[in-house]
Amino acid sequence: LVTTAGVTTNTNQLIRIGHGPNNATANLYLNGQLAPGIRVAMTTYSSARHHNETWVKDGYLLIDASPIDWAPLNNIMKYVTIRAGHFEINYGDAHFRRSDNGNSIRNALVGNYIMDAFTTEVGGEVYVRANGFLAMAGVTGGEVRGMITNPQKRSPSYLTKIGYDKQFSNDFRFRLTGSEYATASSVSNTLFSGDRAGSRYYDVLQNTSSTESAQAWSGAIQPGLSNSIHSVVVNPFVQFKGLEFFGNFERAKGRAAGETANRTWKQNVEEVVYRFAPDQRLFVAARYNTAAGQLTVGTPDVTVKRSQVGGGWFLTPNVLTKIEFVNQKYLDFPTTDIRNGGQFKGFMVEGVVAF
């Protein structure tokens, strides 16, 4: 119970929710070709759950050809790509398949992962690709915003990715990548809390004071490893004709400000999609997602389990409608936590237009 201005509120009383629509979300993409091999890109969230007003998500410069006609540099740039600016970092492969606010055409289901590894940071990445092999190394400021104050509390973040991706035939593709992200100290690192759009699961397991924007990440777990973090993820992808398998096997270790010991979180995701009909316009999908770890130092692990099944129909290549049934359970949460013994389930229907 919390008393404010003489009013007592039970912070563990669930807000009542029912059937109804979410607010519409929208993205605006601006892309420009400045010169051969030099591009600029900017993404704006025109409307989001967390921010209802228009604001910029990211913007960056990408170079994949030599701006100077010099043979040695031309040969190098056949294999190298450079990106610099304020961008969505390339940690893991799951961010290629998630819903990014209004852009949800790449997500076979409606919701994202329980632990959503997605953020934008200021820095640079260098890619090398050859014969199906790929490698990336990057360095960023480690936070959503570029900041120079409190330098004693801030250090760069380093990220790497290695992998292999090959289309062996028209029917078979295989991809396997491993990614690593690390920062020694930060005022507010957001690797698992950088989604500034918000969850699709409005107000689930929130109390009666919940608002659409303040509790924008309902249904998700943000482990709070905001001061230091070391995270690794392995992503296998196999496609045979219309059948796809994608996996996400992740381990993150770190702590929040004021904590003297590290906490560990683990997440596993298995997703299967089957696309069929002419031009693979119809699909069915299933995903099983678990996340487990410590909410605070010295406490037992808690676990969240989510099952999602659904499908969709591409009316055209850029118009999609999809449906999902989601069932999420919370295990071993403290008795004082509103999520103790919690569960939510139900249907979601979503329409997507990309143009």
What do these predicted ranges mean?
Residues 1-5, 13-145, 151-185, 269-276, ...:
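Outer membrane beta-barrel
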Residues 6-9, 217:
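Short glycine/proline-rich turn/loop motifs
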Residues 14-15, 60-63, 71, 172-183, ...:
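Outer-membrane beta-barrel pore domains
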